[in-house]
Amino acid sequence: METFLFTSESVNEGHPDKLCDQISDAVLDACLEQDQDSKVACETCTKTNMVMVFGEITTKAAVDYEKIVRDTCRTIGFVSDDVGLDADNCKVLVNIEQQSPDIAQGVHGHLTKRPEEIGAGDQGHMFGYATDETSELMPLSHVLATKLGARLTEVRKNGTCPWLRPDGKTQVTVEYYNEKGATVPIRVHTLLISTQHDETVTNDEIAADLKEHVIKPVIPDKYLDEKTIFHLNPSGRFVIGGPHGDAGLTGRKIIIDTYGGWGAHGGGAFSGKDPTKVDRSGAYIVRQAAKSIVANGLARRCIVQVSYAIGVPEPLSVFVDTYGTGKIPDKEILKIVKESFDFRPGMIAINLDLKRGGNSRFLKTAAYGHFGRDDPDFTWESGEAPQVGQTSS
């Protein structure tokens, strides 16, 4: 049996880039909670003792940007300079302007257009991917890397591993074989965790705790064997982290946000963008389409692409590839997808309820992935997707 190795990485919520994603989406939540027609393009950057929020926002909402920044940093665990940032004492800079009137008239007619008439907020192409290798219909390498990162945060916050600090990265290499186009995982080949820690803990203690409290609860035994390679804090020391260790910027973890390197990516980031930005809404609808194809037995694995022109409601193209795993020809699946899903941005926002903010709705997406999550706020993952051509064959 011929096999291959594939690797996916993740970072947890204390990584400086992910900190920025979360702040941008917390701003989006605050705007949409008060004004569902808010137009938000919010970027964040951070470095030692500083967070800056900037971009274009047109909203009726009264938003305290500085409070959102400090609350988000504090919730993550950035409560002192020692851990990488002090939420209560760092500098917060805000440079927010209104959306360009040129874009506003072209996309939503200054809010005069009906939902079906709303154009895409920009040009671009987005991809959705699904595979039957996990119950989430997501790639196993990505799922495991993501869950390891989430578990790191869990054992830090609940006190199981008090030596942990907010920043951290994970990476998982899985050995697969190709079964007529479908990807079938065999085992975990290599597992890597690099986590920020305090001065009190030894490397041996770090390795022991990570194996017992992070790896063991996350990685199913069937995927581990005597040949599995573990790299646990291989650099030997990771005390300085967060924005103190590295600069952070919104939108720099787009592969972690999606499919861990599987499928394809159009290049557009998600966080801080309202649903007229098809970088986000377009990616959500094609994930739902791809997931529906696999969930309904039309294929074991598939990718869906959609593309847009700024100001134009209808997509320029829709593409489906099932990697040879389709139960019917791809062109027939494409026809079903076009009949089952409305790819116009205004209708995506309605059908996926993307104008609803608050309750950390989009903040939750900004760490540990936008896809494969079991949460009713992740409407693009829900069972409410159109039943696209179910098959029992």
From Swiss-Prot:
Catalytic reaction equation(s): L-methionine + ATP + H2O = S-adenosyl-L-methionine + phosphate + diphosphate
Subcellular location: Cytoplasm
Organism domain of life: Eukaryota
Cofactor binding comment, as recorded: Binds 2 divalent ions per subunit. The metal ions interact primarily with the substrate. Can utilize magnesium, manganese or cobalt (in vitro). Binds 1 potassium ion per subunit. The potassium ion interacts primarily with the substrate.
Cofactor: Mn(2+); Mg(2+); Co(2+); K(+)
Gene Ontology MF annotations: ATP binding; metal ion binding; methionine adenosyltransferase activity
GO terms of biological process kind: one-carbon metabolic process; S-adenosylmethionine biosynthetic process
Entries under InterPro entries matching the protein: ADOMET_SYNTHASE_CS (IPR022631), S-AdoMet_synt_C (IPR022630), S-AdoMet_synt_central (IPR022629), S-AdoMet_synt_N (IPR022628), S-AdoMet_synthetase (IPR002133), S-AdoMet_synthetase_sfam (IPR022636)
Function: Catalyzes the formation of S-adenosylmethionine from methionine and ATP. The reaction comprises two steps that are both catalyzed by the same enzyme: formation of S-adenosylmethionine (AdoMet) and triphosphate, and subsequent hydrolysis of the triphosphate.
PANTHER family assigned to the protein according to its UniProt record, in alphabetical order: S-ADENOSYLMETHIONINE SYNTHETASE (PTHR11964)
Protein name: S-adenosylmethionine synthase
Gene: SAM
